[in-house]
Amino acid sequence: MLKEKGVTATFFLSGDAAEASPATAKAIVDAGCEIGSNSYSDDSLKGEDRETVRKQITKGTEAIKSATGVETMLLRAPYAAFDEQNWIDSMDLVSAVVSWNIDSGDWLLNGADEQMSTVLDSMTPGNIVLLTDSDECAEQTLEALPQIIDGLVADGYKIVTLSDLVKTDTALSKKLTSLTKVSMPKNAVFPQLPEDDDTTE
């Protein structure tokens, strides 16, 4: 559908979904869209230990690479739950953690028209829209998406991938050409969170 509309987007796949439907994952890349990881099993990473966090991220990216040939370090953490400790535990595995500022509300199952209105009424330049493809939401999202695209284009917006969106921000480094390929410097010093201190001042 996106290809027919002449637009591209960024898809965040869970590793288990890429394993279950490798042809679909490959078709996303072949259509010129960007791909990122939603970890492996779409379970929340917040509060998990270092080993679990790294395993979820690594298995997710490996499954995506196996299905698509694309190596990505771009993460949309499940439920947008990713805390400071998660960052410290995975800084060498993740280039950027992406959230959204417009939730289409597709998961509420209020209908395609309501979903479309939520997006169009909330839109301002640079916004990131969350659309999901779960079994419960997929049919409604597929119905709403052409209307959303047509509405945004009619309002003068251009729909782009996250990496292309970042390139429009002149405050960011010119070297940041793709969010999916940034890595930590080899000599990076990993921060340590302070130990809990019960003393008061």
Predicted regions and their residues:
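Short low-complexity, flexible loop/linker segments enriched in glycine and/or proline
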Residues: 25-28, 51-53, 113-115, 173-179
